[in-house]
Structure formats: structure tokens, C-alpha cells
Amino acid sequence: MRLTSHVARFLAGSLGLAFALSSLAGTDAYQTIPSVSPQPEQTSVGPQDPAELAAFIDGVMTAQMRAQQAVGGMVVIVKDGAILLAKGYGDADRENGRAVDPYTTLFRPGSVGKLFTWTALMQLVEQGKVSLDADVNTYLTQLSVPDTYPGQPVTVRNLMTHSAGFEDGSVGYLILDSDARLLDPVEALIRYTPQRVHAPAGGDFNNGDMASYSNWGTELAGLIIANVSGLSYNDYIEQNIFQPLGMASSTFRQPVPDRLKERLASGYNNKGGRLKPQPYEFVMFPAAGSLSATGEDIAKFMIAHAQNGAYQGNRILSDAGARLMHGRALSPNPHLNGAALGFYENHVNGRRLLVHAGNTTQFQTEFNLLIDEGVGLFFSVNSESIFSFSARKELLNAFMDRYYPATLPAVQPPDDFAERAADYAGSYRFNRHSYSTIEKAFSMLSSGISVTPTPHNTLRISGVGGPLAKEWVEVAPDTFRRVDDDPMIAFSRDEQGQVAYLLNIGSLPSMQAYRIPSAENPQLHWLLWAAASLGFVVAVISLLRNWGRDKRQGGLARLARISAGLMGVLQLSFLVLFGLSIVALTNQPLGPYPELLTWGLTLSLIAIGFTVLSAGFVPVAWYQRWWSGYERCQYSLIVVLAVAFLWSLHTWNLMGYKLP
């Protein structure tokens, strides 16, 4: 919405002091460590010649598209308030021979759309209708965020920095293959309300503060926008961001309006070793990622933020509001990238970027803004599960190395690091996962992030791709730099002073991990499942082999063997159905949880009764000397394994129907 000049002047004057005071309440600024931080070349002026820039980007993209088998992609670069480069690569629709055109082709940039939600929310902050530090429940009438941590409400600022402490979830409902399964925004928020598993992060990351990315939290922000403005989320975005910027080829509506359908790119997945077009993705939480837009439209949005809210005579934010939004709002460590209000910080070659990534099951996107240089780089491909994380970063790194080079000081490990290296060793798990639903079980499919000391007095981090899978050297207490590049990570400690958390994985402040408790070690549980499965098989075989003899003996001894055998059949059936469900979810990522899973959970619940019954027979079997001593030991061990298996199911939320 365009502001008249006198209203703009009034807001700038009246809000300037408030924004300045708010900024003082923020976290410390990014602090370099001069001896190990990149030293930018001060004479660098960035890209100047569009033709030279196009030739360079062509070389990088051609190699990347070929290496990563991407079907189509686009790159848009802006500088000094104008598009310097906008190029398409490959196909938007390979089956019909339609090439990617950044001026006409709509891509689905996923979570990059969150930046529009945060910008809209910032507009309401400017208007005095929303306070950054107010309890979000102040603006909600249809639902409320639980008061899990009394005296520590979730604030608007927490939503914008992903520091509210919500658990995460997505499988079976976040991205759908049909609008028939879409729910009304309020209904969706209520049905999929996550638990608050951490207190809101306030900056004390050495005492357990954790930031964790939340799609649900962003959709909640979309509801606040609608409630406060009196408009639907879509109407507000269209009237107050799209129209002032002239973004006529962008929409959050699902499916896209008829006027845009013919220009929408197809998304591709790797199915059986071949890239195949996939159905349109419907997003349950539109404010978190249902955007469809051309590269040209994204360029207009980038330019507006690069110019602190201004675009061709219009404004989407005041200068003061934009500066507040772009400033550091949360930081886990002064030497690490922090979070702005909606954006993330990144530092490459000693320069600060405001960034956001976007992933759907079909599209991968990077939004990068060198805010001090007035330069933006947008990159997107329509081939998910192909374009790797490291490949996506290579374009930005190549661009920065060419146009904003820096000298990276060599770094030497401290001589005494070996004395404390063991403090960091262990396995860590991303804190962005479900804690209360069956989705937690998917954490068992990964061994987590492994941190191992090396003979070189460094740490080797493995178990995750991209820039993390390298060696890291200590440059400050609990703070590490990659040996061959400038990314930084850090560890934080619990109240007992023990290393408990790994911060800024992939240079993102919302990507944090905690040390995996011994009771949740995936290897332990897989070993237990294997042993229990063997026990279940033995129980079934024992029942069948001794059926005739037990029938002649009759009585409780026979009932004990039947109980254990049925327990084995039921739990083995559960394991088979659970495995088939995982395969089904892998092959149909947009579908709901398969009914096979519900059947399996039902069989496992029935098995609990037989497990309890079998456990009750153990002391009786020993007291009355049923069977041989070997058979009694075997029976007892099977029951112990069965009980341990139930504990494992409980640990991973597989006991009962804990579906989202």
C-alpha cells in the first residue's frame, strides 16, 4: 500500500525513536575474530558489465545443471535498484518443450515466501497495530498458544526469529497432492498445533536456549496479519506488497489463478533413476510457503529490501522499519550468523548477507541479499532431490569469490586443544523434529551428526552433507571455523557446564542440534529391534514346533507358549507394515500416512496384552519347572526383549495412534 507523503513523514518521525530504542534491545552485533576472519578486498565494486556477468553465470550454471541433472532453473541478480541479470536455464516443462523464462515463468520458491509474511507483519508493526514483544495471543481470537512456560509467552519477535520453541512436523499434511485435503487456515492451525518443547529463546544459549525453524509459527503470523488488518492473508499481501511493487505475476493462492496457470513451471522428482514431472503441490500453511512467482517479480522484492523498503517511488516499509527488520535480532553466539526479523544472516568473504532458502518436494531456492552493497542474487531450480545442498551454495560462493573476493587467513589449532577435544565428541540430532507424534520415529532413521576429534587437533563433523562435513578448528572458546573456508559453528553448554548443543549448522541460526541422549541412540534401538525380531521369530517357531506336545500337556504351560507366539506374530506383522509404510511415504511424499501404518499400530497395541500375559507366566514357569531349563531361559529372554521393544516403541511415539 502506497503511503501519502505526509503520512510517510509522520511515521518516519514518530517511529524513528521507537525503532532506535527497539534496536538497542537487540542482541550484540556480529563480532569478527580478526586473526581468522576473511579480509575483504576493499577495492571490490561487484559486478559491473551485464555481458561479462552473464558469461560467468552461464559457465557456472551450465556445469551445475549438467552435474546435478536439474531440468530447469533461473538466476536473477539485482544491483543499484535494477535487474543486472535475469536468465533461465533448461526447461520449465520438458514434456512440452517450454523453456524457463525468468520474466514469464512462475517457480515455487517455497519458504522464500515467508519473507513476504514477515514484511507484511513488519508493516503492521510500523503502523502501531502489532508490537514485536507482545504475546501473540494478544492478536488471536480463534485459538491460543499454550502457556507451557508460565511467564515466558511466545512473542511476535519469537515468531520472526523462529525462536518460539515449537516442535516441527510435516509428514502427511504440510505438502499435499490435492486441494481436497487442504483445511481452512484456522482449522489447520488448530489441528496441527505443535507442542512447545523449548522456552522462547532470549539469547542465553549456554543455558539451553534453542531456536528451531517453524512452518506452523509462520502460518500463525499469517493469521495475525489477517486478524489485525481485517483482510484475508492473500488480500493483504496482494494489496500491500504485490501491488506497490508491481508484482503482477505472483500469488500465494492455491491453485494459481487461471491467468497464471499456463506459465507455471512443472516440478520434477527423481523416480526410479529418472526425473519425472509431479503434480502441483498444495501447501497446508500458505503463509509459510505457497508462493508462486517469476524471477522478475522476486527481483522487485529484492530491490525494495535492498533500498530499505523503497521501489520506484513506492514504499513497502519505511527506512527505519526496514533497517530494524534487517538488523540482528537474535544470535546464539557473537561470532556466528544470527537472525534478523524474518531474514537470516550469512557472512561470505567477510561481507554480510540477508538470506533465506526455500524447499518443496520439487523446487529448491536461494534468496541472497548483500544489504550493504545493494546487490541481490536469487536462484531456483525445479528439480528437488537432485540439486544438492552443496551445489546450491556453489553458485553463491563462485559469485562472491569473483566479485567480492577476500583473503582467508590460515588458522592453526591451539596446541592444547587435544586436552578438551573429547568434550565435544559424540552424536547430535537436529532439534527441528517432532517430539510428540509418530514423526519422531523418523529420527531413528538417521544416526545424527557425528563429532569426532582428529589427530590434527581439529574436529571432524560427519553425518550431514554440505559445508558441515569438513574439519573444524577452534578459534575461540567453544567456537570453530572450517579449516578451508569461512563458515563458523559453535557449541554451547548446559547448566552443569557440559557441552550439550551444536549451533548454526549450515551457518543458519535456526539449525541447531542437541547431544543425543543415550536412551535415544539410534544404533541401540536398531540393535534392540533386531534382537527382538529374532526373539519374536523364535517364539513363533517354538509355538509351532511344540504345538502337539503342549496340546497333550494342556494347562497354563500351553497357554504361555500360545501367548508368546501370538505376541511374536503381532509384532512381526507390525514391523513389516511399518517398513512398508516407510516405503510408501518415500514413494508418495505428498500423500497421507498409509492405512498400513494404522493397521500395524493396532496390531502392536494388541501385542501389548500378550506381552503382559507372557511376562506374568515367566515366574510361574520357573516355579513350576515347565519345559527344560533351556526352554525356560529362552522364554524369559524373549519376554525381556519384548518388553524392551515396547520401551523402544514408546520412545519413538510408535505406541498408540500418535499421528498428527
Model-found features: residue ranges?
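Short, surface-exposed loop or secondary-structure junction motifs
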Residues: 87-93, 148-371, 399
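Bacterial N-terminal signal peptides that target proteins for export
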Residues: 2-11
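Short active-site loop at a secondary-structure junction
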Residues: 66-74, 96-158, 202-217, 286-289
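Short, conserved catalytic-motif segment at the N-terminal edge
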Residues: 45-107, 129-131, 146-148, 194-204, ...
